[in-house]
């Protein structure tokens, strides 16, 4: 046995997973034989923690399918999906629902707000559903960041489209999720409201260390990301760091042939 004077070694500090989410050798196949369609065709991709990743590609390239499978909203036909260190491919539906509720935030093109609840109640609804206490200090910080402090008592019908999407972003942020998946979050908004939402998502990464993965067809929206992934025919075919509008347009033009 070591003597009394032997040095005491503390346990190593926990390390952050290399990827906030990861898809490994992922296939999503519809139909069979002559009618088989491979929406995802052996794709492997990881999403870094505390970074903003955009996913782009032509219509039918598999970008929304990739996001849905990575977020546990749909299942791969073959392959693995990890959220942090959890292989969600092995979870049953109840376990998967719980993981999504606890670890993942969502922002969709459709705002998906409950019309009978106020903006504030919509923001905290996922926490209420999970029986989790609202951190009022964090809630105040989030609603201030997205510019909703004076709109919390309004119903969705009393808010503009841009304001409703701000509620959706705040709802995702207030849960402190491990990762936020955003599917065309500015698709139904005017240019100014779109810029506001993208700024809030960017600020969530820079100020709060949030991880954001966004599907978009808009080259301007993609410039808010740290990294852009390009898909074609269900495969990852290119990526771009520190994107600009011109560099994104050039890559998309090359994919279009």
Where are the predicted features?
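Compact Cys/His-rich metal-coordination microdomains
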Residues: 2, 223-226, 255
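ABC family nucleotide-binding domain
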Residues: 18-225, 230-231, 236
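Conserved beta-strand-loop-alpha-helix hinge in the C-terminal portion
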Residues: 235-257
């Amino acid at each position: 046995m070591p003597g009394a004077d032997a040095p005491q070694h503390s346990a190593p500090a926990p390390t952050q997973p290399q990827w906030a989410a990861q898809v490994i050798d992922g296939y999503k196949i519809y139909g069979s034989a002559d009618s088989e369609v491979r929406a995802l065709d052996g794709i492997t991709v990881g999403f870094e923690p505390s970074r903003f990743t955009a996913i782009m590609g032509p219509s039918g390239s598999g970008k929304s399918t990739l996001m849905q499978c990575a977020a546990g909203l749909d299942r791969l036909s073959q392959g693995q999906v990890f959220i942090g260190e959890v292989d969600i491919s092995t979870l049953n539906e109840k376990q998967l629902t719980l993981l999504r509720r606890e670890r993942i935030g969502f922002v969709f093109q459709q705002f998906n707000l409950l019309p009978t609840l106020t903006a504030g109640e919509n923001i905290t609804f996922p926490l209420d559903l999970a029986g989790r206490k609202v951190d009022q200090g964090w809630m105040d910080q989030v609603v201030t960041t997205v510019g909703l402090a004076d709109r919390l008592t309004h119903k969705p019908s009393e808010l503009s489209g841009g304001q409703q999407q701000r509620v959706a972003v705040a709802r995702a942020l207030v849960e402190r999720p491990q990762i936020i998946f955003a599917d065309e979050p500015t698709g139904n908004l005017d240019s100014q409201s779109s810029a506001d939402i993208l700024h809030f998502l960017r600020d969530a990464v820079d100020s709060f260390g949030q991880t954001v993965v966004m599907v978009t067809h808009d080259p301007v929206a993609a410039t808010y990301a740290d990294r852009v992934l390009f898909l074609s025919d269900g495969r990852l075919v290119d990526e771009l760091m520190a994107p600009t509008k011109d560099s994104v347009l050039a890559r998309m033009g090359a994919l279009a042939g």
